[in-house]
Amino acid sequence: MAETTGTTGTTGGPATTETTGPATGDPLPKGFRSAELGWPELERIPHPPRRLPLLGDVLGASRRTPLQDSLRYAGQLGPIFRRKAFGREFVFVWGSGLAADMADETRFAKHVGLGIANLRPVVGDALFTAYNHEPNWQLAHDVLAPGFSREAMAAYHPMMLDVADRLTGHWDRELAAGRAVDVPGDMTKLTLETIARTGFGHDFASFERARPHPFVTAMVGTLSYAQRLNTVPSPALLRRATRRNEADIAYLNRTVDELVRARRDGGGGDGDLLDRMLDTAHPTTGERLSAQNVRRQVVTFLVAGHETTSGALSFALHYLSLNPHVAARARAEVDRVWGDAAVPGYEQVAKLRYVRRVLDEALRLWPTAPAFAREARADTVLGGEHPMRRGAWALILTAMLHRDPEAWGPDADRFDPDRFDAAAVRARAPHTFKPFGTGARACIGRQFALHEATLVLGLLLRRYELRPDPAYRLRVTERLTLMPEGLRMHLVRRTPAPTPTPSGGPVGEERAVTALSEPRCPVHGAGD
């Protein structure tokens, strides 16, 4: 999972704590509770109009869609702006030049605050939520990184195929019954089963259940609670929700404890992530993960390892259904590359270059980890004009960075996978596409997620024609991560795939795509 964080920046949540940068290890000062302390010339940064005393920039704000509020303000105020609520002020960045400046690892580091800090009661100092000064980040990273090597990925591939086969079996049954499929719900089942099987040898039997597995319900509860903390001045206002969150955390922990106990009682697995957590020592120090840290890492991987990928797949399928020319071109590539093979081999997935472009373009328009925070390692000047004190931080709005016209052109809201053609990528400035975060603390499971999602898109395109609901308009649910809400789709079973053309080139080269149904608008939710 990318280093996503809460998306409002208008919280009464926990203050940041002392941190260090991964490169220097030098302790940074206590994180600034409000931007006034860390930005000496804050008044030069624009803020929304109609600011209220004490309350701040709350007029027109929605507790349910804080990201889309921030996107609206971004379109109005420019590439850097600030928001204030309940006595705290925060700086947001989305301009591609400023974001590239903050990607400089010699000057900036990951900042753990807002939504990420709100998850620490769930997973403590696990990979995703550890403060930079906490040693367990480096320990876990070094122990677990080999679990995402090419050799490890090739070993996961057959299990990914098995889970995908359960998805298509479920979709075949829905198709036979004349029902539309629940895309986000089924992608969540798929990706949970995939990370559970490949990483921990566990089967949640998600496709055999009429309702979501209780683990998913508890996970959604904890993510939603972490997001809600960003919208109130004090957790005391969420007493009932806090009790529910405590119960959700307890269920997550019990589930993981049972999973670990079963592995220990069974005498080990096949060298998966859980085996690494339990049995592998650090290659240099010989240190091992503690029992508490193992629990935290397992929860992190089960949650982060499927939540963002399910959203990415759901958005990609949404855009494929709306753009039949794109779907035809992607499907032709699958037929050509995979041919008559009953199941694709590991190496064949990476050859689906156009399918991968479709996935990247969906992640551009709706990065499921929609923001990440960066803090200054030393006093510096952002973009040559905004002084920052050491420890000051800003929230990079990935969802708006990915639509910056300076980087992506005047049609940045339009779905067009050819933006990720190799020549187009080379011509574009660096640090303009950040769905997995940036730097040393970027998503450790990036290649896992991309392989899984590309494989699944290829399998679904090979098997089905996708038909959108003509009445559906994209609505986006925010719970730290993003997911299309209520997306259902009709399927048509494909006839046998045509014989690939002798030239080996894909058919259906039409470049035309369906534009978003609204012109460029800061709020990219209604009508996509």
Please state what every model-predicted region is:
Residues 308-326, 331-333, 447-463:
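Cytochrome P450 catalytic-core helices
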Residues 396-424, 521:
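Conserved cytochrome P450 K-helix/beta-meander segment immediately N-terminal to the heme-binding cysteine loop
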Residues 21, 31-43, 111-118, 136, ...:
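Cytochrome P450 heme-thiolate monooxygenase catalytic core
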Residues 2-6, 17-125, 135, 139, ...:
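N-terminal membrane-proximal hinge/A-helix region immediately C-terminal to the signal-anchor transmembrane segment
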Residues 39, 47-50, 157-161, 216-218, ...:
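Cytochrome P450 I-helix active-site segment
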Residues 24-45, 74, 164-168, 217-221, ...:
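Cytochrome P450 proximal C-terminal region
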Residues 57-78, 258, 342-383:
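Conserved cytochrome P450 K-helix E-x-x-R motif and the immediately C-terminal K′/meander segment
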